[in-house]
Amino acid sequence: MSIESIQFTLRERFAAPLPEFYQRRIIFWQDEDREFESMLDELYIPDVTILKLTGTNNFAVKKLLLHDDLTGNYLIYNPFSYADPKDNWLLDIEKFSEEYRSDLISTRMNELNIEASPAMRKTVKLYAKFFDSKERIERLKRIGREYHTPLQLHIDIMAVLAGLNGGSAQDVFIAVLSAGQGEENNAVLSNIKKFGNIDAFWQLVRKYTGYIHEDEKALVLFAAHVLLTALAQTMNPSVLKGLERFISDSNKAYCYSIVHEWRNREDNGALWELCRSVEQELHLASRFEKQDIETLLTADIFPSIHEVILSRFFSEIADHVVKTELMLKTAENRRTSGWIERFENYYDCLYYVAKMQNFYQENAAGFHIVEPKAIWKLYTEKAYEMDSFYRHFHYAFGCTLKNSNVLLEDKLKHAADYVEGLYQNWFLKELTGCWTKAISDNLAALGYVSEIGKQRDFYSHYVKPLAGKNSRAFVIISDALRYEVAAELCDTITRTTKGTAKLDAVQAVFPSITKFGMAALLPGRKLSVNDGMDVLVDEMPTRSTDERGKILCAANMNSVAVQYTDVLNMKRAERRELVSGKEVVYIYHNTIDAIGDKAPTEKKVFDACEDAMQELSNILRIVINDMQGT
């Protein structure tokens, strides 16, 4: 800056009106780097006395300003800075005076809302290369912070160099560790070295995480330090004996927060790879394998903890050792642990094996019931849960196969063999045998089981009483929907809607295949079969939706039958028009049967059950919102 420019600015400052209650103006020209000391003799400002501090005249200047001359205007040139404000004899006068700076650093500090203190000025000087770029300055400015301490300025400058829009030291550390473990190829660390201050970075690292920088493998060791210090927050110290060099006790909570924050981000793939690398380098899995399950339950951070826990349980299950209480406790406990999204389906498998085993233990003696109605009650109130546990196990098992874990895949498959034995060879065998024996006399004499509602009475018992001038009966028929799936859907409807749901069961017609079951749900007096094995109701065919609609209309002319997919594709106005004036609406849904009825896709039936429940919940919303269902 030229002497002319400085002189012009200072003359303007002194010519400006004085603040209220002030009789004169004193301005301290701060120039710690003595950039403008040589220009001082050329400076002339009318009616202003210019004084230069020499380091030995401070007391004399103070006496002059506070005693000898209380009315004169003064420009005090100060080329000194003080590490300790107590050393500044003129600090009290500076407090009620004005400040002027003419150097680039001061201009920059003012522009970026950086406090004009010696400590902040020193910090700005550290980043000369950073401030060479207008783009970097603009990005720092956009953070919009006021800087009163060097710490926050260090952090924000490094955040800019890491490609962030501000943040915390934690965000900077995550950005550095995400960029790779090799210092030469780590773009973020290279930026900090080139345009920032690498020493300041490692000082920040030490302050927050406790890691002391080492020249060899600095990033690798930093990563290991953060992860193991975080692990120490949730694991018994005895497990980590021999790894003390990687752990800072006073920084455990902070390191844990780094990992927790990073892991909860969508882009946590680099953390996963980092954990895997450290696990392998320090042989952590073998260390965890020596611990009991209770010790590992609360431990977090490393994926191998999940693998050790699950591997042990699956191996035990395959050997017919099923610790139900511990398995249930583990499955529930681990649902909130880190990396659960990658292991959730495995824990679901564990959970449902335990639930199946519990049911088995409660009924290990078998089912010795002779009354059909009592067996019916047992199944509809309790035993159906075994079917539900089995389905949920296989659904979770199928999900694991879509993105399998090499260490767990075979162990889970061996555990699945135990599940099949428990379900097929015990549950189905025992319950089916009991049921078959109990109903044999009824079937021989009547062709059905007495004292249990019949599918053939569905229309007269459930539909007809609801259909009338002031009400409309909606019937959603989902082919091959098992009772246990319906029970879960009933709970879902109760939980997610304002209405109420009730679950009931009736015995199917024989044979219990689709074309007979669909016909049995229609009104009419007589069910028969022609020579072509077509099922008829009162001599009318029942194969197609239109044919079923005609049978419905024969019983109530204000009826309609439609497929779920057709309703789904209709516009809202079309849906309203479809049911206008109707008292009975049959909607046919076929997701499960369409999958399970064909050999190539029958293994997908467990997925189809999940889809079916979502679709049935959806059609229920459509009925309520678009078809005036209540």
Model-identified regions with their sequence ranges:
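Hydrophobic "anchor" residues on beta-strands that sit immediately upstream
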Residues: 475
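…; additionally, a secondary subgroup of soluble metalloenzymes is captured
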Residues: 1-472, 482-629
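Ligand-binding pocket scaffold of soluble enzyme catalytic domains
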Residues: 479
